Amino acid sequence: MAGLLNFTWILALSIFALSLSAQAESVTDWGDVGRWKIRVDEDAGNGCFMETTVEDGTMIRFGYVPNRNGGFFAIYNSAWTDIVAGEKAKVTLEFDAKQFTGDAGNDARGGMPGGYAFFNNPNVRDEFSRSRTMIIFDENGHRIEVDLSGTSKAVQSVEACQKKQAE
């Protein structure tokens, strides 16, 4: 491993925000790139993000939060019933060459528990885009390995989407 990069994950959700997740999201579809859906979240300042669901039913989201000048990574799975809303957990994203570790706020989307982390380190996006594999694990024993094939093109599409939002 080329090194451990620690950066600040900013706890993105409060109890209030968790209650909002039960309401309908203000999200619209923008396009598709391979297995990734490109979407726009009005509540995040028209932030574009990519979303996919992998084999075990885990939903992964990655994108921009323009009204906070950063990005986010979120992951949800209906089997993770031990995740307690409002708490936070230490999460590590391990890419081909680097690791990023920080706190993620527990969240829920569509009835699925999971976590959401805001980041302002562009290296996270760069590694997500260029790596072939990502392993996500937390201090509670949740672990998932994700094939990132085709992700670079999806990240480019998210960036194009974000540029269109600024017009």
Regions found by a protein language model. Name each.
Residues M1-L5:
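N-terminal secretory signal peptides that target proteins for export/translocation
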Residues T8-S19:
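Bacterial N-terminal signal peptides
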Residues Q23-E167:
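A generic "folded-domain core" signal
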